[in-house]
Amino acid sequence: MAHPIPVVVNGATGKMGRETIKAIAAADDVTLVGAIARSADVQGQDIGEIVGLGPLEVPVTNDLEGMLCLASQEREVPVVVDFTHPDCIYDNVRKAIAYGVRPVVGTTGLNNEQLQELAEFAEKASVGCLVIPNFSIGMVLLMQAAIQASRFYDHVEILELHHDQKADAPSGTAIKTAQMLAELGKTFNPPKVTEKETMPGARGAVGPENIRIHSVRLPGLIAHEEVIFGAPGEILTLRHDTMDRSCYMPGVLLAVRKVRQLTGLIYGLDRIL
């Protein structure tokens, strides 16, 4: 019988971290071996008790390198799932790769230069790494539908809406959507007039191939995206709404299982489906 995949969760007490702990505990082929969080008031506490599952015998620690070192000694190839913060994610991934622990990154905010550097580092180390801005299967389907629609429309804008604790804007999912549309090799939104913003930023950020991205941050939201196409006489709106973070867990578990089979960095859930 195969041994379960050892998994460390970094950002274990955050919203996504808690859902990931629950998903790992419920799965038969993965096992939680580490839980990392920065908050001083949870150090040493059982992560199972914190998330409401009862004892899992996994104490919370803030020692990332120490936990990566321990995980690297597991019989099976270990994985670290990271839901932390844009300010530390680059260093977190480099440390994981250095210890041979396969990173599954749900934290957004990495820029293109950082992604390229991490890709080169992972390739040299022959370590698989997955950077996934959105783990929802429905979101992947929205992106694919947007690609099909963009063949017939020259005008498109992206609206992304998230909870008010999200640190980066625009979201990694919106950027990924714009990048996928831009890969078609066409320039969108040919100008009709000379625009003048009376308030800077009113028309949103200009992404690749002139695709504008608009960000909303409000309490009450979780994660939502609209891709809006326009043509004379009609509007086509594609929308995905996250109602509960549990919708991400099938994608998270899929990534945990897949990343150990890879060498190098892959960006986007669509690349492993």
Swiss-Prot record:
Any one Gene Ontology cellular component term annotated for this protein: cytosol
Q: Name the Enzyme Commission number(s) assigned to this protein.
A: 1.17.1.8
The main place the protein resides is cytoplasm
Query: Which CDD domains does the entry link to?
Result: DHDPR_N (cd02274)
Q: Which positions in this protein are listed as binding NAD(+)?
A: G11, A12, T13, G14, K15, M16, G106, T107, T108
Task: Enumerate the catalysed reactions.
Answer: (S)-2,3,4,5-tetrahydrodipicolinate + NAD(+) + H2O = (2S,4S)-4-hydroxy-2,3,4,5-tetrahydrodipicolinate + NADH + H(+); (S)-2,3,4,5-tetrahydrodipicolinate + NADP(+) + H2O = (2S,4S)-4-hydroxy-2,3,4,5-tetrahydrodipicolinate + NADPH + H(+)
Keywords assigned = Amino-acid biosynthesis, Cytoplasm, Diaminopimelate biosynthesis, Lysine biosynthesis, NAD, NADP, Oxidoreductase
Q: Where in the cell is it found?
A: Cytoplasm
What positions constitute the catalytic site?
Answer: H162, K166
Question: For this chain's UniProt record, which GO biological process terms are given?
Answer: diaminopimelate biosynthetic process; lysine biosynthetic process via diaminopimelate
One short Pfam family name for this protein? Answer: DapB_C
Q: Which domain of life is it from?
A: Bacteria
Residues bound to (S)-2,3,4,5-tetrahydrodipicolinate are H163, G172, T173
Gene3D superfamilies documented for this protein? Dihydrodipicolinate Reductase, domain 2, NAD(P)-binding Rossmann-like Domain
Tell me the protein family, please. Answer: Belongs to the DapB family.
Mind telling me what this protein is named?
A: 4-hydroxy-tetrahydrodipicolinate reductase
Source organism of the structure: Synechococcus elongatus (strain ATCC 33912 / PCC 7942 / FACHB-805)
